[in-house]
């Protein structure tokens, strides 16, 4: 019995012993705030895949407006005053160019056009599949993907001589034309290109929709264009 009592006392005493390190060791060392300001990130030109296409324009570009010119290293559209200087048929020695390299398709990611000598944008045509609409549509999207992306329908629908169908999405100052290859002329399109988006174009809201496939409207971005 005495052994049991002695054992109990040992347990109680050991349970009441202070835990090593439990006592405060003194005032904590004060932290020293850094006076070095957080560096501001340098502005950069958006990547092609970050340019959002809308019925009114592309990124900072808007149809009906003059392209913003802030910094040639940052602007997505820049003016080259001598780009067409050595081409006799050119309507002007200079041209506005997408500020990105030419891609494997032979085009820059997009092109912009000005009509009738105006200094405001009237056409923005997309040539890169990396550029997408807010709903995810891009060059190469299927017709089914397009119809699912716009369940409420389109402002208009145009049959382009059976070669393609042009769907119009209305904006405020502009409209987005989404051209989809069609099978109205059997054999015109390779099987893997049929029923797919083959051109995305932004034009002013008061312009009439049109089709490009099978026509000669690819003059946009060329020195001999209007």
Question: What are these model-predicted stretches?
Answer:
Residues 1-5:
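Bacterial N-terminal signal peptides that target proteins for export
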Residues 17-161, 193-226:
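Short helix/turn-capping signatures at newly exposed starts of structured segments
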């Amino acid at each position: 019995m005495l052994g049991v009592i002695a054992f109990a006392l040992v347990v109680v005493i050991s349970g009441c012993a202070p835990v090593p390190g439990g006592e405060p060791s003194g005032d904590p060392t004060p932290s020293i705030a850094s006076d070095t300001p957080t560096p501001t990130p340098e502005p950069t030109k958006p990547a092609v895949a970050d340019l959002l296409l809308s019925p009114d324009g592309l990124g900072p570009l808007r149809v009906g407006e003059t392209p913003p010119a802030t910094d040639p290293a940052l602007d997505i559209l820049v003016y080259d005053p001598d780009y067409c200087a050595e081409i006799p048929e050119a309507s002007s020695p200079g041209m506005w160019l997408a500020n990105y390299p030419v891609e494997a398709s032979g085009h820059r990611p997009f092109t912009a056009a000005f009509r009738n000598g105006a200094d405001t944008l009237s056409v923005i045509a997309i040539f890169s599949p990396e550029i997408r609409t807010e709903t995810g549509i891009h060059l190469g999207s299927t017709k089914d993907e397009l119809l699912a992306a716009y369940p409420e329908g389109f402002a208009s629908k145009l049959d382009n001589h059976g070669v393609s169908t042009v769907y119009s999405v209305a904006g405020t100052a502009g409209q987005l034309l989404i051209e989809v290859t069609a099978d109205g002329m059997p054999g015109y399109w390779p099987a893997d290109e049929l029923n797919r988006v083959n051109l995305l174009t932004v034009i002013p809201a008061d312009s009439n929709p049109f089709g490009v496939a099978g026509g000669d409207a690819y003059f946009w971005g060329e020195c001999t264009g209007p």
